[in-house]
Amino acid sequence: MDRGLSTGAHQADDGLRERTVASQSSSAPGLEALTATGEGEVKDKAGKGKKTYGRTPQGKVFTVPQTHDMVSQLLSPSEPKNLSDVIVLAILAAHILLLWRLPAGVKVPVFAFIYLFWRGAYNAGIGWLLHNQSNHRTLVRWAEKTKIFVNPATGQNPHANLYKLIKRELETKIPADYSFEDAPIEYNTWLVFRRLVDLILMCDFTSYCLFAIACSQRPFDEGTLMTVLRWSAGIVLVLFNLWVKLDAHRVVKDYAWYWGDFFFLIDQELTFDGVFEMAPHPMYSVGYAGYYGISLMAASYKVLFISILAHAAQFAFLVFVENPHIEKTYNPPPPRKRTIEQENVSITPQRSDSPSAPASVDEQVPHAPSYSSGPPPSVHNLLGFRNLDLYRTIDTSSILIQFLVFALTVLTPSTPWFQFLFVANAAVWRIWYSVGIGFVLNRQSNCKAWTRHFVKYGESPQEAWNQWKGTYHISMVMCYASFIAAVWKMYSFPADWGYGLVLLRHVLGAGLIALQIWTSVSIYESLGEFGWFYGDFFFDESPKLTYDGIYRFLNNPERVLGLAGVWGAVLITSSGAVTFLALMSHILSLGFIQFVERPHMQKLYGRSLRRDAGLTKSLKRSLPPSLQQLHGSVDKIFDESFEFIEELIDTARPKLAAGVNTFVKDTSALFQKYPARVTISRIDEDLAGYDLRDYSLEIEGTDSLSPNDNDQSGREGANARMPLDRRGDLKNLVFEYGSPIKVKWTAPLNHSKKDWIGLYRVTDNTSREVTRVSSQGRWIAVNEGSYDNLTCEKGIVSSDILIPASQRKDNENRDLASGEVIFSGDKLFWTQGVFEFRYHHNGKHNVMAISRPFEIRISRFDEDEIPLMNPTSVELSLFPVVRNCLDRDPQIAPETVDEPFGGLVERDGKYAKRVVFAVHQM
């Protein structure tokens, strides 16, 4: 729907492998051509070809050689072959031979296991590698640690034979513009990773086809016509799948096909057309149509179910691996705004005796309210389980109404009379949801009737907006709740799931329901709550018209996909009454789009509305000219028919009254919690030769302003009220909430490079020799390059600084190594309590040193001082706490009390929760 295109921010077209591409800065010398043209493809000196330039995370620029897809490399006789190709082909041949040799009774389970193994290697195995490469550069760090790409002549690579093998394999595949010795380690690592991907993907597809062959059959009661139709449909789906893959590879090339942006970036503006204009994530959505085509040809539910499982696993791969990398790489938070735009309003009072111009008539009107025409700020979202708030009337009402509908549906019998009542109830709510809500929106669009009603009684347009959202939400809930209740009443459990197409109808119906849910979620993600509740009907200063998300491919996704679930219910129930409800719902939805949304969008946005969406453009380009003209004629007839109906309705339009409910303002916050680091306690047997006196930990932090020596509250005994008698010079360590803590460590010169320091509650570990509690990510390595991730190195300041024996305080005659690390951000506990640091040996959990216990405390306001406080003192008290809660990050933490937060605060809800907790404790 076009009204959904009024979102808050414009996003560019998809980039690498369906990504939103952010422009990459080019600062490397010698690439003036790139920066001048914005492209990374530059003609060589002969002018015969183009070269693509890549850029490593360290900024090194190199030429990306041309490569070919895996099918051509493996099967094309014109492509050079190497040992890895022979191994892959041999494994594929072994799969085929196994199908031929196995007994008929074991072929299906064996190949089901083989396929699931390769599918797991794809989605779980490759997914794990890519996830760690994206977050910790794990694959590149493995290559750096093993030095397999370093020339053995330097004496640093102990794997000379492996080096020669890899060099020969890669240079055989890329004969031009490639030098194994000169290529960056990121590029060489990617090439080796490609060979692993080739093996897994080829075995995955081959084993699936062999499994389908093992399961293939022809139903005994199937006619010739049905067989021809089944095979024809299957072949069409397979050919369509093949076209999707080929066209996608034409667009993204090998770089995105093999997840090259997990290793390096290319300085190139990519143009996305073809299949990428047809559907979101075409490689993972319509790119699996061939699986269902093969299922049709095999006529096997086993193949169908394993295809659905594989498709679901691929979407999980997209959600948990690719999408986080896309957001991190191509959609970073907006740049920090250091300036504040002040409103042109003077708050300086004027003297009564100063001359002034006479006030206008409008200014002399008492209590004349003025309202902003812009949309209200986001405070509290309405949709989604995370935004459920039982203190809100609309949320409580929705739950109670749904519970009532559910109770009536379950407790009443499924007699014809009750079935009629439930179907009639669903029809009434659908009519209200489309016709009633449409009438209200039409009046709001033409004369602001809804807003004027509330302003007439002294309310603000924001209050009218809140009441409208409640009305629309409760109407939507009742529309679908009543429809589900009617479907439940009309549904009868199958007596025989194997009879006819019963099972297939249920599978297809469930798929259509899932499609509608996905469509609704995609629409909401593109629109936000402002667009979902038709905010541009209520506020003139609507956000800029954009086409992103699902609207990049479809102008009105709810026209077909948005109602797929109701037709899924028709397939599942095979009921005439449900078919009537589905048909009525579809007709009313089309009328709502034509008579309510479309006129308003044309009036509001005019010529900025596009005529054809991405899918329509792709289909039109593929049609011959005669069919394109026919398409235009059909559109004209369709528009004229709707205009006639619109004129007919305008002559006899009923006057409807609108209901009222309540709702408050919305907020935007994305909660993404990173999984905790799970560790297993291990005791290192090689502790001989290490003296615990050589290990030590000293900590420094920002002292808390809260008093910690005299905590008497009057509840103690007489002796406990006496001043604390200290027999040493050490005072309790009390640090600010969220402030970084510096840890200085010492260790023997021969200490393990895999030593690490963890942060724990004092009460977490009863043993002082071995740590048996997970650090949950609150740990830092003492040396860089010792682990396969970068997170544990965040915070290292210095390592292995020599301390001569003469500077030791314990008079020992051994030199020591020392270093510093800083714990901050996610490596801290965001609560109050008493904590300690532990120094561990060799990547294990043997404790070599424990720091002094220290307390994290939030300073509280004295109740006696609160009446004397002014806003300035409150701001100055909260300011350091807020900065600590935002990790003192200059990109998000304010430098002054008037400066706004950075964009990342809105994306990650942990920052808001930290601030709320701290203010509550204060």
Curated annotation (Swiss-Prot):
Comp. bias intervals (Polar residues): 346-357
InterPro entries: Phopholipid_MeTrfase (IPR007318), Phosphatid-EA_MeTrfase_fun (IPR016219)
Recorded GO CC terms: cortical endoplasmic reticulum; endoplasmic reticulum membrane; perinuclear endoplasmic reticulum
GO BP term, example: methylation
Residue ranges annotated as Cytoplasmic topological domain: 107-109, 217-223, 299-300, 416-419, 495-496, 584-922
Broad class of the protein's primary localization: endoplasmic reticulum
GO molecular function, one term: phosphatidylethanolamine N-methyltransferase activity
Positions on the Lumenal side per record topology: 1-85, 131-195, 245-277, 322-395, 443-473, 518-562
Keywords from the named record: Endoplasmic reticulum, Lipid biosynthesis, Lipid metabolism, Membrane, Methyltransferase, Phospholipid biosynthesis, Phospholipid metabolism, S-adenosyl-L-methionine, Transferase, Transmembrane, Transmembrane helix
Record has Transmembrane as a keyword: yes
Basic and acidic residues bias locations: 11-20
Task of the protein: Catalyzes the first step of the methylation pathway of phosphatidylcholine biosynthesis, the SAM-dependent methylation of phosphatidylethanolamine (PE) to phosphatidylmonomethylethanolamine (PMME).
Family of the protein in this entry: Belongs to the class VI-like SAM-binding methyltransferase superfamily. CHO2 family.
Protein name: Phosphatidylethanolamine N-methyltransferase
Organism encoding this protein: Aspergillus fumigatus (strain ATCC MYA-4609 / CBS 101355 / FGSC A1100 / Af293) (Neosartorya fumigata)
Gene: cho2
